Amino acid sequence: MTLTVTVSLLSSPLHSVCTSAGARFTGFAGWELPLQFQGLMQEHLAVRERAGLFDISHMGKFQLRGSGLRAALQRLLPSDLTTLLPGQAQYSVLLNEAGGCLDDLIVYWQGIVDGVEQAFLIVNAATTDSDRLWLTEHLPPAIALLDLSQDLALVAIQGPQAIAFLQPLVSCDLAELPRFSHTVTSIAGQPAFVARTGYTGEDGCEVMLPPAAAITLWQQLTAAGVVPCGLGARDTLRLEAAMPLYGHELDTDTNPLEAGLGWVVHLDRNPDFLGRDRLVQAKTNGLERRLVGLELPGRNIARHGYPVAIADTTVGIVTSGSWSPTLSKAIALAYVPPALANLGQELWVEIRGKQVPATVVKRPFYRGSQFR
């Protein structure tokens, strides 16, 4: 007798409007999510040239409240949170005792709300459960964690014209919202959390709000001409911007220094965080590997897990790779020894049993409106 096990996937509050827009769905981190709508290439270029709209409701959403919250978070993250003002945000990594990355996340600091310190954490969907458990075990009892992951929708509007499309629909002045800042506004008569953040390399906002208001926002933006986009375009966009994907560039065996995230590690300003000794040791003794960008000839696509070699010796591994719609070339991210991480270094990637040349190039591969 054959036993069939059916795995039930979670659905986003925007599933129905995505279906109506022609979405092709896929399973990702326990959710059924749009892979693409009209096509990856069209969606990717819409974000680079104008504006695109993503349903990212699968992301984990934690509200943290309690006395001493800032100090408690500072103990679990390598970043200095002491200078964050209410309305500011910090990208960081959640570390284990060995300095490995449990997740990458964004801390949205809200300051004192009703007399108590408060922050929002947006974490990866695949690690939502493990992050919640880790935080619950490592934060003081005085800190309350409210998991709103399945209660609120989250959409991202990204692209050089994203702000212009969103502005008429919100009650705040988005021109006054700097990069990596956030505010509470009103959308469709409902409170909405709007952050000037994203995962594409372009300018834009991520908006967290009740499901009904999210559906209204989605319909208004698409009616105005914003292109709905799926996970496929989100991945190629973040790869061009050389942004890490957990499970590819980041995992528990990888420290943030190796991953090129030294800019979120504030050893001089955060003297006591979990995994700090290991990071100091790695910095003192030298890293064993470094994340690099690779460019390959033709349409040779290096996928996750493909070996990287020099001569006949395997020296590294590809973490992500794709055709770049913006640059019209094959690009990849890979880990290699520091001695082989210099720009211009010639390497080989094994693709379907064939050795294909690859050159170490500067990251990010493309600098969008986020960097301008």
UniProtKB/Swiss-Prot annotation:
Leader sequence range is none
Q: Entry's InterPro entries?
A: GCS_T, GCS_T_bac, GCST_C, GCV_T_N, GcvT/YgfZ/DmdA, GcvT/YgfZ_C, TrmE/GcvT_dom1
Q: Write out the catalysed reaction.
A: N(6)-[(R)-S(8)-aminomethyldihydrolipoyl]-L-lysyl-[protein] + (6S)-5,6,7,8-tetrahydrofolate = N(6)-[(R)-dihydrolipoyl]-L-lysyl-[protein] + (6R)-5,10-methylene-5,6,7,8-tetrahydrofolate + NH4(+)
Q: Does the keyword Transferase apply?
A: yes
GO molecular function: any one? transaminase activity
Alphabetically list the UniProt keywords: Aminotransferase, Transferase
Name a Pfam family for this protein.
Answer: GCV_T
Which GO cellular component terms are attached? cytosol; glycine cleavage complex
Q: What is its EC number?
A: 2.1.2.10
Q: Name one GO biological process term.
A: glycine decarboxylation via glycine cleavage system
Give the protein's biological function.
The glycine cleavage system catalyzes the degradation of glycine.
| Protein family according to the UniProt entry | Belongs to the GcvT family.
Q: How does it assemble?
A: The glycine cleavage system is composed of four proteins: P, T, L and H.
PANTHER family (UniProt xref): AMINOMETHYLTRANSFERASE, AMINOMETHYLTRANSFERASE, MITOCHONDRIAL
Query: What is the protein's given name?
Result: Aminomethyltransferase
